[in-house]
């Protein structure tokens, strides 16, 4: 079995130390194979915040990581930096690739940079990005769980969040479904949920799921939610067995002083 941990929206600069410590403990206990970090690493793209985030990732002790920038990882008040060096701090902390790719024997994970320096927070996926990701997905093996990662949500669970939905998501989801994607992971709105993308008026062509993470360690939790992360389990099916994965949401409990399983779902795949 392979295990992936999906965290998002840590917003270092607003982190809660007890929650950070609890997440490190969870990672060391469960020992995931891959860390997916779907953006908004920092609160204000400050060097000290990026340094704290990088230290945190090292403390997790996970060998493979795919990280993406979020809109908060581009300077907001430093106009010169936003115009001419929008990703300088992020790249210094997390390496030279804004659209990374991670592959293991069982996992195939493609990152898409949906931030734009000329936009305050709204995300965009371009036709070129859709085509690139589709081409990559077609190279995956059937035995691999095929995952696309964005920052802004590719689908939303409530009408009031529609304005935060990724621009260009409709055509992207259709194309990525045809190309073989199983899951699309994201963050941005600090609301964890799992959506079946193969149902509804804009249903995709084959089973595919949107999996959103809440804010992992920040004090900026939405009303009615708490700090949370996702754990995704995948085992390559034997001949004749159906493809499916498990998604667990782990919520932080101040009473317990750690993360606890809040929900577990088995997702059927094609």
Q: Could you describe each region identified by the protein language model?
A:
Residues 1, 32, 62-64, 141-145, ...:
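A general structural motif
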Residues 1-59, 77-80, 132:
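N-terminal active-site segment of His-dependent metallophosphoesterases
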Residues 6-8, 35-40, 64-71, 113, ...:
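Active-site neighborhood of phospho(di)ester-bond hydrolases with catalytic His/Asp-centered motifs
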Residues 13-15, 43-48, 71-82, 117-121, ...:
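Active-site environment of divalent metal-dependent phosphoester hydrolases
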Residues 51-132, 140, 175, 203-207:
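Extended active-site neighborhood of metal-dependent phosphoesterases/phosphodiesterases
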Residues 142-157:
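Short acidic, glycine-rich surface-loop motifs adjacent to enzyme active sites
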Residues 162-238:
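Conserved beta-sheet core of the metallophosphoesterase superfamily
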Residues 234-270:
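A short C-terminal boundary segment appended to hydrolase-like catalytic domains
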């Amino acid at each position: 079995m392979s295990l992936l941990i999906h965290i998002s929206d840590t917003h270092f600069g607003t982190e809660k130390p007890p929650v950070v410590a609890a997440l490190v403990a969870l990672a060391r206990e469960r020992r995931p194979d891959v860390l997916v970090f779907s953006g908004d690493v920092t609160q204000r793209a400050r060097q000290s915040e990026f340094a704290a985030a990088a230290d945190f990732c090292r403390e997790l002790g996970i060998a493979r990581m795919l990280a993406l920038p979020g809109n908060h990882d581009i300077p907001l008040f430093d106009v010169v930096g936003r115009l001419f060096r929008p990703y300088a701090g992020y790249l210094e902390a997390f390496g030279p690739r804004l659209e990374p790719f991670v592959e293991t024997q069982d996992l195939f994970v493609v990152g898409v940079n949906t931030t734009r320096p000329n936009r305050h927070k709204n995300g965009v996926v371009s036709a070129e990005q859709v085509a690139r990701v589709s081409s990559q997905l077609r190279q995956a093996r059937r035995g691999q769980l095929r995952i696309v990662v964005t920052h802004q949500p590719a689908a939303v669970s409530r009408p009031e969040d529609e304005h935060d939905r990724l621009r260009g998501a409709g055509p992207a989801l259709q194309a990525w479904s045809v190309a073989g994607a199983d899951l699309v992971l994201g963050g941005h709105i600090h609301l964890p949920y799992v959506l079946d993308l193969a149902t509804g008026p804009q249903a995709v062509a084959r089973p595919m799921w949107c999996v959103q993470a809440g804010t992992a360690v920040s004090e900026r939790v939405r009303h009615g939610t708490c700090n949370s992360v996702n754990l995704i389990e995948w085992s390559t099916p034997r001949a004749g067995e159906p493809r499916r994965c498990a998604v667990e949401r782990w919520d932080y409990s101040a009473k317990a002083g750690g993360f606890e399983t809040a929900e577990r779902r088995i997702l059927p795949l094609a």
